[in-house]
């Protein structure tokens, strides 16, 4: 899945966090590239006729190619490449810039927003992209629950959307909404999508090429294998330098790193980042550089609050002991976050605190000294005693029914961090008398959506505007019934949190809104259902002999894969092209890329709302 912005100014992170963030950033290089197609001979091989192909090896499969359903980082990244959004984010510093809309203005009461739609954007089938396409997209989401699956939170407050002319879009709101310049919704061609029947089941993966108006055109797809795109030579901002872009799935990230060494690919980001061992093994290698930049995701431990639907029906089998806040707090007090950063991430991360990473300083939250659940095993044991879970003669924590506590922790089989942290949890919680079973699966979707877990490794990539990742913890995000799929991340439903969410959504003053967002994070922290352990860096590596230049985001200490836009792939320049404009420079020839996509939860990428099989981001 994806998310959004708060432009320009913002409060800086607390001093000690800023210092840790800078230390964790390490040497932040900016670059990228790519090459090999399917049976990659060398990274520089193209498709013939002089075509240049950029191949991105990813560690995540596609959940859906429908922009109305997709939530995984890979899928939403593809949609950013193939469809325009009303606005975009500047690669330099994340401030809002024009996209399909060239300008926008609000009425004095902030309830009517008028967007001017550019006249130089065409769909890849030759038809003009107009305001009618945007109006139809939003109206479909407002009237069809299936079409609102991925991004429905953006239109829930819309009263009416019209297109008075081909270049004018008007959105009327029920109440003020602060995200009107950060609507993370791909605009689709009405003349194509109005033929679709059931939006809840249509995955847009049968007929190619797919009509779009982004910098690339989606031309082919094979599930769990590859996604192929071609450069849109008529893209209004200018055609990409590469003729083809291929995302190729790698389940084994060591194999992806090996491919980088061989020159079969030009860039590797890991799963979702390189492990310290992988990164260290690449340092000093000829023609390879490691980029270590502050990330935009969090790595957390989510606790099942008791899965339920909007109709009140409870389902799943979460351990009832976790409904006691003292138990939840005790568990987190027995987690040594510093050890996780030092030993698991080996310094390539920052200790966790609030829900939003310190990279977004205006929204970054840090608990007060009195509020913080610092590492305190003795205090954790005391809380468990107070909650009635005392140790028996065997040293096991038991409830009033005499049954020992044994929690199932859902983890991603493809994420080495989940497994490493899981072993520490077994040690730390074992000292409290609590047993845990690591349930590491390739596909965490089914048990997650069914509420059949006690705790789970969780993670999302956060956009400049945090509204989306905040919305997934509201009561409105719950599934309508146990058989439906909601947008909820972890079945949290808390009235105080919901009230704060509504307040920030309607607050146009940036400072006041940021304060409300911090209060929301404080509430999440106190309830203990979302415990952020770390903010991992984006650790990537690329071949300097295969890339001329590529854009990082932000331009200073930024990441390459999983950006809030299409800048990296759109700007990438083959090393032998003679065109080094518009990007971070290096040397090389670009033609193979391994961007290890984020796997669901622990990886930090978006948690798939609709299909959680193995992935993140939302953006």
Give the role of each language-model region.
Residues 55, 130-137, 170-172, 214-215, ...:
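Alpha-helical secondary-structure segments
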Residues 57-108, 139, 211:
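N-terminal lobe/hinge region of extracytoplasmic solute-binding protein
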Residues 102-147, 170, 247, 256-259, ...:
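Aromatic- and charge-enriched surface segment that lines or borders ligand/interaction sites
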Residues 116, 150-196:
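Surface-exposed binding/hinge segments that line
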Residues 185-240, 244, 377-378, 382, ...:
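Gly/Pro-rich hinge or "lid" segments in bacterial periplasmic/extracellular proteins
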């Amino acid at each position: 899945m994806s998310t959004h912005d708060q432009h320009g100014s913002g409060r800086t992170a607390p001093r000690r966090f800023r210092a840790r963030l800078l230390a964790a950033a390490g040497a932040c290089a900016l670059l990228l590239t790519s090459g090999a197609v399917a049976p990659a001979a060398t990274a520089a091989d193209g498709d013939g006729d002089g075509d240049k192909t950029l191949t991105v090896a990813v560690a995540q499969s596609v959940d859906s190619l429908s922009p109305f359903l997709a939530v995984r980082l890979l899928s939403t990244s593809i949609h950013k490449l193939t469809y325009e959004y009303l606005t975009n984010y500047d690669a330099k510093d994340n401030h809002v810039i024009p996209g399909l809309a060239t300008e926008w203005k609000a009425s004095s009461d902030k309830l009517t927003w008028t967007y001017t739609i550019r006249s130089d954007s065409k769909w890849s089938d030759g038809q003009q992209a107009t305001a009618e396409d945007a109006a139809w997209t939003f109206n479909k989401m407002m009237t069809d629950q299936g079409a609102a699956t991925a991004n429905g939170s953006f239109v829930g407050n819309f009263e009416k959307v019209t297109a008075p002319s081909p270049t004018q879009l008007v959105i009327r709101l029920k109440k003020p909404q602060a995200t009107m310049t950060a609507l993370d919704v791909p605009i689709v061609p009405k003349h194509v999508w109005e033929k679709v029947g059931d939006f809840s089941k249509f995955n847009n993966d049968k007929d190619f090429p797919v009509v779009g108006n982004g910098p690339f055109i989606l031309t082919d797809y094979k599930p769990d294998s590859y996604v192929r795109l071609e450069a849109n030579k008529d893209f209004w901002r200018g055609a990409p330098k590469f003729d083809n872009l291929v995302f190729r799935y790698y389940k084994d990230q060591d194999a992806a790193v090996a491919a980088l060494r061989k020159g079969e690919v030009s860039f590797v980001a890991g799963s979702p980042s390189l492990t310290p061992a992988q990164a260290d093994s690449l340092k000093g290698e000829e023609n390879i550089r490691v980029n270590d930049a502050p990330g935009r995701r969090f790595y957390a431990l989510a606790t099942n609050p008791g899965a339920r639907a909007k109709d009140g029906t409870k389902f799943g089998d979460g351990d009832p002991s976790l409904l006691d806040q003292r138990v939840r707090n005790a568990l987190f007090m027995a987690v040594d976050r510093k050890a996780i950063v030092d030993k698991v991430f080996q310094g390539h991360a920052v200790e966790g605190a609030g829900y939003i990473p310190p990279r977004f300083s205006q929204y970054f939250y840090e608990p007060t000294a009195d509020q913080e659940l610092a590492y305190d095993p003795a205090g954790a044991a005391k809380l468990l005693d107070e909650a009635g879970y005392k140790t028996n003669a065997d040293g096991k924590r038991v409830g009033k029914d005499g049954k020992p506590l044994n929690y199932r922790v859902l983890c991603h089989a493809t994420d080495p961090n989940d497994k490493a942290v899981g072993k520490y949890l077994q040690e730390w919680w074992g000292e409290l008398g609590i047993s845990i079973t690591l349930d590491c699966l390739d596909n965490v979707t089914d048990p997650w959506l069914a509420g059949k877990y006690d705790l789970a490794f969780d993670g999302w990539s956060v956009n400049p505007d945090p509204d989306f990742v905040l919305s997934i913890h509201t009561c409105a995000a719950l599934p309508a019934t146990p058989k439906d799929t909601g947008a909820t991340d972890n079945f949290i439903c808390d009235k105080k949190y919901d009230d704060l969410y509504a307040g920030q959504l309607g607050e146009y003053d940036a400072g006041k809104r940021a304060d409300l967002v911090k209060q929301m994070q404080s509430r999440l922290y106190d309830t203990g259902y979302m415990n952020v352990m770390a903010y991992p860096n984006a650790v990537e590596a690329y071949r300097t002999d295969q890339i001329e230049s590529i854009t990082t985001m932000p331009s200073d200490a930024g990441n390459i894969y999983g950006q809030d836009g299409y800048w990296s792939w759109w700007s990438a320049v083959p090393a032998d092209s003679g065109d080094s404009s518009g990007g971070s420079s290096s040397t090389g020839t670009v033609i193979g890329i391994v961007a290890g996509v984020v796997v669901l939860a622990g990886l930090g990428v978006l948690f798939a709302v609709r299909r959680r099989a193995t992935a993140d981001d939302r953006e």
